[in-house]
């Protein structure tokens, strides 16, 4: 999955940086594997509109040249003009700083609340899916639902820039497509891969569906599934299910 562009004849400052993203491979050793951190960086680079290449890394057969490139490091990581960077949060900050306007899109959210929306969902989901005690299942499911409800309320609450102070109309519900508005931001790159895992895994191993009444979340997911930046960086549902086959505990008496 390599994208390239000829650099001949360009000034130094106009040249695209040489970026390679290394992500976790799927069960076949080649396709995109289940890793929300890999997808997060994949989405950021895609949204930035920068030329980059992608290498899937089979963790069972990690090539020697990769061992030398980033010893002891699991994907995701990047090389940026041959410099290896391995910390996902720092990579995000670095890319936002160096791939900046006017040449590249700014992806930081305008509203600080967008950065923390849904941040506790994945922890509640993990506790729910790893539990093997039937008597604890209901309480853990309620805990997950509570965090999903909180996200749903945020997505349905109008952002300040959706409210026109000069308008007589009272806007009660947001119609925005993503967390921070109608365009994806870093906050979406962080949350959407995790939210997708929750949807797929909870259905497969607990027959749990995100309630249809959570219209904000379903609007959000529907909009995400319509975007190449999300769907083309996403592992298949089967890969997600395989990744959780040993993690998801059966409820046993």
Curated annotation (Swiss-Prot):
Modified residues (N6-acetyllysine): 24, 130
Protein name: Chloride intracellular channel protein 4
Function: In the soluble state, catalyzes glutaredoxin-like thiol disulfide exchange reactions with reduced glutathione as electron donor. Can insert into membranes and form voltage-dependent multi-ion conductive channels. Membrane insertion seems to be redox-regulated and may occur only under oxidizing conditions. Has alternate cellular functions like a potential role in angiogenesis or in maintaining apical-basolateral membrane polarity during mitosis and cytokinesis. Could also promote endothelial cell proliferation and regulate endothelial morphogenesis (tubulogenesis).
Bilayer-crossing regions: 37-57
GO CC terms in record: apical part of cell; cell surface; cell-cell junction; centrosome; chloride channel complex; cytoplasm; cytoplasmic vesicle membrane; cytosol
Tissues and organs where the protein is expressed, per its UniProt entry: Detected in blood vessels in the retina (at protein level). Expressed to the greatest extent in vivo in heart, lung, liver, kidney, and skin.
Chain positions found as Phosphoserine: 4, 132, 167, 236
Phosphotyrosine found at: 244
Motif (G-site): 35-38
Enzyme superclass (EC): oxidoreductase
Modification N-acetylalanine, positions: 2
Gene3D superfamilies attached to this UniProt entry: 1.20.1050.10, Glutaredoxin
Free-text domain note: The active G-site contains a monothiol Cys-X-X-Ser motif which mediates glutathione-dependent redox catalysis.
GO biological process, one term: angiogenesis
Domain of life: Eukaryota
Family the UniProt entry places it in: Belongs to the chloride channel CLIC family.
Subcellular location: Cytoplasm, Cytoskeleton, Microtubule organizing center, Centrosome; Cytoplasmic vesicle membrane; Nucleus; Cell membrane
Induction and repression of expression: Up-regulated by calcium ions in differentiating keratinocytes.
Quaternary state and interactors: Monomer. Interacts with HRH30. Interacts with AKAP9.
Organism of provenance: Mus musculus
Renumbered residue ranges of the record's region Required for insertion into the membrane: 2-101
């Amino acid at each position: 999955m390599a994208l390239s562009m000829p650099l001949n004849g360009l000034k130094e400052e106009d040249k695209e940086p040489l970026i390679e993203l290394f992500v976790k491979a799927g069960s076949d050793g080649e396709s995109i594997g289940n890793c929300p951190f890999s997808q997060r960086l994949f989405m950021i680079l895609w949204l930035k509109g920068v030329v980059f290449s992608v290498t899937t890394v089979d963790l069972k057969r990690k090539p020697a040249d990769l061992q030398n490139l980033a010893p002891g490091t699991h994907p995701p990581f990047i090389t940026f003009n041959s410099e290896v960077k391995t910390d996902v949060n720092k990579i995000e900050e670095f890319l936002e700083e160096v791939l900046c306007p006017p040449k590249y899109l700014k992806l930081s959210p305008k509203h600080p609340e967008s950065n923390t929306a849904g941040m506790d969902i994945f922890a509640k989901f993990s506790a729910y899916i790893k539990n093997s005690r039937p008597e604890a299942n209901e309480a853990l499911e309620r805990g997950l639902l509570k965090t999903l409800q909180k996200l749903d309320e945020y997505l349905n609450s109008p952002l300040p820039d959706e409210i026109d102070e000069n308008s007589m109309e009272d806007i009660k519900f947001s119609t925005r497509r993503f967390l921070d508005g109608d365009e994806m931001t870093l906050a979406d790159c962080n949350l959407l891969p995790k939210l997708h895992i929750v949807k797929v895994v909870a259905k497969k191993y607990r027959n749990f569906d995100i309630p249809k009444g959570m219209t904000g979340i379903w609007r959000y997911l529907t909009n995400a599934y319509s975007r190449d930046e999300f769907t083309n960086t996403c592992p298949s549902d089967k890969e997600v299910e395989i990744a959780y086959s040993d993690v998801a505990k059966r409820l046993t008496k």
